[in-house]
């Protein structure tokens, strides 16, 4: 049984970052979180999480915790070592970090632009994977050890302060990008910190939750909300103002009193950092938002096309959906294959939406 103190101590952020455990942390992505019920400083390594989901009701301490994490990164890493993409649809919490040199883009407040930025991050992840493959490196650390300083890749931390606003604006697109990043971006050095005050299943979907084994819950309204975040109840009984339950991969749920960082401290740190240099947004602006166009001369009639032709020939009819199901490919690819079959005179005229088209036998 845990009985709260009548007079609660405020855990200062300064105290946590001054502790031996934080100062000795080797990772550039070390996060200062707070203290446990025994009074010990608690830190976490984002590279091992490798992504973090934070939830809690209004006033429970969620946004203060996000600020503590951002400040931890600013204390630990230079702009050459860690970059950040900040998405803040609420327009309130992350605006204080505008123009710091760690940013790859101005703080994004428009949900549509946020969806586009997440799509850019997916393309950047894929680019990094190609670079790693060329060097035979398994992850970003191995890569950076084997290339000159000017070719080294920084970590990128994507921070979203209110997921619900993005999900309501363009849920499918946002969910797809977040899922791809959560599944694959760790080796490429891209990590996500996502916060929401609406821990409902339409915001924290099953797919998103499955890819975020590290989760923090502040006080929530109900047992259902607690189970949505932590897969167990308990968060509804927290005291608010930084009281949280932390679930990390391979560990039991731990109760932590979150570190409190003041606005004055944030302004002092960001003012100092801005004086060291200005942000460079040119790299992020050049990342495409659409996949590169296919070289039609060389790529059109590939193995997949000829397999689809054989499938249509054996079935006697073919549709875009049947090609999708048979070969487990997306709609756009299947539609392109159907267009090529039509160009080659292999399919009859359309019979209506969703209906298969007759396959015309090939002449030998």
What is the predicted role of each segment?
Residues 104-122:
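Conserved nucleotide-sensing/catalytic segment adjacent to the nucleotide-binding pocket
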Residues 62:
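Conserved lysine of the Walker
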Residues 72-76, 344:
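Active-site catalytic microenvironments for nucleophilic, acid-base chemistry
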Residues 1-30, 35-37, 41-43, 48-49, ...:
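P-loop NTPase motor-domain active sites and their immediate coupling elements
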Residues 65, 69:
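Hydrophobic positions on the alpha1 helix immediately C-terminal to the Walker A/P-loop
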Residues 52-53:
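Short hydrophobic/aromatic beta-strand immediately N-terminal to the Walker A/P-loop
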């Amino acid at each position: 049984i845990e009985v709260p103190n009548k007079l609660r101590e405020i855990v200062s952020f300064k105290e946590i970052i001054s502790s031996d455990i934080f100062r000795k942390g080797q990772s550039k992505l070390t996060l200062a979180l707070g203290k446990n019920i025994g009074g010990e400083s608690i830190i976490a390594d984002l590279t091992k999480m490798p992504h973090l989901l934070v939830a809690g009701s209004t006033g429970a301490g969620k946004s203060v915790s996000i600020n503590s994490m951002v400040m931890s990164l600013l204390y630990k890493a230079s702009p050459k070592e860690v970059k950040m993409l900040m998405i803040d649809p609420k327009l309130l919490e992350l605006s204080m970090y505008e123009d710091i040199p760690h940013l790859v883009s101005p703080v994004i407040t428009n949900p549509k632009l946020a969806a586009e930025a997440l799509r850019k991050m997916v393309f950047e992840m894929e680019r990094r994977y190609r670079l790693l493959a060329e060097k035979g490196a398994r992850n970003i650390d191995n890569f950076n050890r084997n290339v000159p300083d000017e070719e080294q890749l920084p970590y990128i931390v994507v921070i979203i302060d209110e997921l619900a606003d993005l999900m309501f604006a363009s849920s499918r697109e946002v969910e797809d990008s977040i899922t791809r990043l959560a599944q694959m971006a760790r080796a490429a050095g891209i990590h996500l910190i996502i916060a929401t005050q609406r821990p409902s299943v339409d915001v924290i979907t099953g797919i998103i939750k499955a890819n975020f084994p590290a989760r923090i819950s502040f006080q929530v309204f109900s047992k259902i909300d607690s189970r949505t975040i932590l897969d167990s109840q308990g968060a509804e009984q927290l005291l608010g103002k930084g009281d949280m339950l932390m679930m990390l991969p391979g560990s039991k749920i731990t109760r932590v009193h979150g570190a409190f960082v003041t606005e004055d401290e944030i302004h002092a740190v960001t003012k100092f950092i801005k004086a060291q240099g200005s942000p460079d947004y040119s790299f992020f602006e050049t990342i495409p938002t659409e996949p590169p166009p296919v070289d039609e001369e060389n790529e059109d009639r590939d193995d997949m096309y000829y397999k689809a032709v054989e499938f249509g020939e054996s079935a006697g009819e073919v549709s875009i959906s049947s090609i999708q199901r048979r070969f487990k490919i997306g709609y756009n690819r299947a539609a392109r294959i159907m267009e090529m079959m039509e160009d080659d005179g292999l399919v009859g005229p359309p019979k209506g939406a969703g209906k298969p088209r007759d396959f015309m036998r090939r002449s030998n």
